[in-house]
Amino acid sequence: MKPISLRIYGTGLIGTSIGLRAAELSWPLSLIDSSIGSLRIAKDLIPSNQDIESPELIVIATTPDSALALVSEIAESYPESTVIDVGSTKTKVQLEVESIPDFSKRFLGSHPIAGRERGGPHSARSDLFAGRAWVLTPSQVIEPWRLKLVSDFVSAMGAVPYQMSTKLHDALFAKISHLPQLISVALASSISELGTEISLAGQGLRDMLRLAGSDGALWSQILLDNKDEVLSSVDDFQELLDVLRDAIENDDEHRIREMFDDAGLVPEKIGGKHGMKRREYTFVDVVIDDKPGQLASLFNECGSIKVNVEDLALEHSPQQETGLIRLALSSSDADLLYQHLLKRGWKAHKQ
């Protein structure tokens, strides 16, 4: 596709990652940020930054409060540009856009489903959006050519565009993003008084607390922006927690097991790699000796018969003389690799 000239407001994780990818594509771009420190880092990372008077596409990648304040300024200063935001909530900013005559024709809400545990330009990556979903929330009056421009932009970032209404977006992400964040924070708070004995916690607790260290200033804005949907999700969750509590109090083993069984089906609904539709894999387990070059040799075997390894996991303890590599492949590739490894003398097992 032809280059798109960009002006990016906000040089945090998302804005700088967009800039890095645009620089890879040799697109003209300029960066704006009220934080001198963040802007300096972003400009060091993206030396191709330049001044663009009339950008084709403006990206608002600031905090929610700053984004709302920028909308009217950008609408007036850049009357021809297509404008998108990349925030986690959509309804509030869309209402602000609709208050400006004709701006809805060239504004498109968007939300890249990508991130890292730590924000800021120093965490930015040019491949942050590769294979990720990127939600678009076009209004009924958006000009079609602008919608195509943004869709092409998203694809160029390496992401996959999905369309939905602002209302559906905010209701959905209250459940699948905002509620998990609240649960993690509440769980962390509930055990904050524990002493050194907390180090005995297993991986389950560590996994659930991963979100607890998120940026409180940013998340307070997100939660308040989406207040009604978040409260509705919290109420629904509280009802289910009460049901589970009652079942425990009443020694209702059947109800407890029923809830666990129902819950166990949910992970299968979640997409596989990069949030895309889950693929069915066949697993090949390979036991290897703990000596140099074993993993490289195994990958050479895969390459020699041109099979595609979709994912892998390594199980090995420091004092263990052997390790186990689990390879995820398509059914046909798994059959081919399994037979090949057996013939080559590897200790292979197919699941």
Language-model-derived ranges and their functions:
Residues 58-59, 84:
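N-terminal Rossmann-like NAD(P) cofactor-binding module of classical short-chain dehydrogenase/reductase
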